[in-house]
Structure formats: C-alpha cells, structure tokens
C-alpha cells in the first residue's frame, strides 16, 4: 500500500498578536505558513516574527522573508529553494 502525505500551505494575514497561537499550531502540525504582514501594525508584526521565529527554531523549521512584509515558515521536512530565494539571500535586501 502506497500512501502519500499531502503537505499543506496555510496563508495567514494576522491583524493582532492574539492570532499567534493559531499560526503556531499550524507549524506544530507540520504545515508551511505564508505570513502576510502588510496590513499589520509594525510593532505587532515584529512581535509575531520574533515569536514565530522561536517556534520555527524549536521545531527545527525555517523562516525566510520572501517579500516586503511577507515570510514563509516551513517545517523541518520542507526545504525552501529557488532562484528568487537565492537572489534575496545574496542581495541582502530582505533577509
């Protein structure tokens, strides 16, 4: 019997820090999370990124800034690859 686990990507656009526990739960469930902070207050956005960076670290995951105010947080079993990611890392513009 062949079974394939389906990876899920969750898109979130939090407006307050209270949303962080739901986002952390997605990470604990091994879902990748795209975090859009465009409409989030700067102080709240910083707290969210700090907390979720800690969650990613504790779960052996990764967090990468992929655009202005947008991050991707992945579980340990997901690699982030691609020309855009390499370009962003090499230029130092976003990471």
Name the predicted role of every residue range:
Residues 44-50, 55-62:
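Feature captures the catalytic cores and cofactor-binding loops of soluble hydro-lyases/lyases
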Residues 17-20, 42-46:
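Loop/helix-junction capping segments adjacent to catalytic residues or to phosphate/diphosphate-binding pockets
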Residues 33-41:
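Short, glycine-/small-residue-enriched flexible loop/hinge segments at domain edges that mediate gating
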Residues 1-33, 57, 62-95:
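Positively charged, small/polar-rich N-terminal and surface patches that mediate targeting and assembly
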């Amino acid at each position: 019997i062949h079974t394939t686990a389906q990876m899920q990507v969750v898109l979130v656009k939090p407006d307050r820090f209270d949303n962080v526990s739901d986002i952390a739960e997605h990470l604990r469930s091994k879902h990748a999370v795209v975090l859009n902070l465009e409409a989030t207050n700067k102080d709240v956005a910083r707290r969210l990124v700090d907390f979720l960076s800690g969650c990613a670290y504790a779960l052996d995951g990764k967090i990468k800034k992929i655009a202005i105010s947008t991050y991707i947080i992945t579980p340990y079993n997901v690699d982030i690859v691609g020309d855009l990611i390499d370009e962003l890392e090499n230029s130092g513009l976003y990471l």
